[in-house]
């Protein structure tokens, strides 16, 4: 993905501390205090431009959402989208997924969303895939006992890798789809990439996974 650099992004993000949390480590274990109402907490890693995040937040107002994004220029677009929708149940973090343990406490998150992440197709880059064992270890620590991971991708190789990685890690699956848009899942909210790929007739792969006790 080619990113357009926006040198002003950092300054603009800092102007919205109530939406883009500037020192998220200070809220570790107390994220519900950042929202108007204490509700279940769903986290999207690699939130991109925020289309999925805002769509979910509108559809499920009784859930609090946090979008995590490492690229400031992309996060700026997400911030503008959340502001335009005036969503009280959304916060944004400028963080890398590898830093999640710094900002969330154990058993604090109810659900993780991983949507259309970089497939890192080369074998030597497997550890960078967000469904690799090193990231699953992080998610497991942060999820509540009945917490879930919802994963979507257009990349068949990454999907097969993720099924194997999660299965080897001892996870259980449900609602696995090899062609999401033919599955009749009514509550599906599409990402920017999902709209693009589905318009070309490409299948979207999806799964829900939980960690066994």
Swiss-Prot record:
Example GO molecular function: tRNA (guanine(46)-N7)-methyltransferase activity
Reaction(s) this enzyme catalyzes, per UniProt: guanosine(46) in tRNA + S-adenosyl-L-methionine = N(7)-methylguanosine(46) in tRNA + S-adenosyl-L-homocysteine
Positions contributing to substrate binding: 122, 154, 191-194
Pathway field: tRNA modification; N(7)-methylguanine-tRNA biosynthesis
HAMAP family: tRNA_methyltr_TrmB
Function comment: Catalyzes the formation of N(7)-methylguanine at position 46 (m7G46) in tRNA.
Protein's recorded name: tRNA (guanine-N(7)-)-methyltransferase
The organism's taxonomic lineage, starting at the top: Bacteria, Bacillati, Bacillota, Bacilli, Bacillales
